[in-house]
């Protein structure tokens, strides 16, 4: 065989031999939903939200809002489990929320009397008493941070100059 024939045979055999090997799957890069990307905040890395948790109705969304609340208001519908942040243009950003057992009892209006970034958290005495398996180790409090159940922000609701003990806060549960 000539040199050219050998090179041509080798060139034609390489793809055939490659087909005999194991197939290597290309891993798809996970899709990140805009607005839910990884964020670095005060030195804490908050991972991107897995798209499987962002099912319909679970993503923040700008929606028409005509209930008449003042721009800047935060309106919580505890039964629909939605929070609305009212804008000036007749819209609101709607968020899916969780509502604690006690949260259902909040009625009327309040105002944000305090805001905290990376708030500390202490379970109530009742939480420690009724569920020591979950809360006893945190009875002395848990400093703000990536493992704190309040998440990165908390709004403390007041009424008549007093803390109502109701909070609007983030979570470390990304489900």
Language-model segments: residues:
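N-terminal pre-domains immediately preceding structured catalytic cores
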Residues: 2-3, 7-8, 13, 20-175
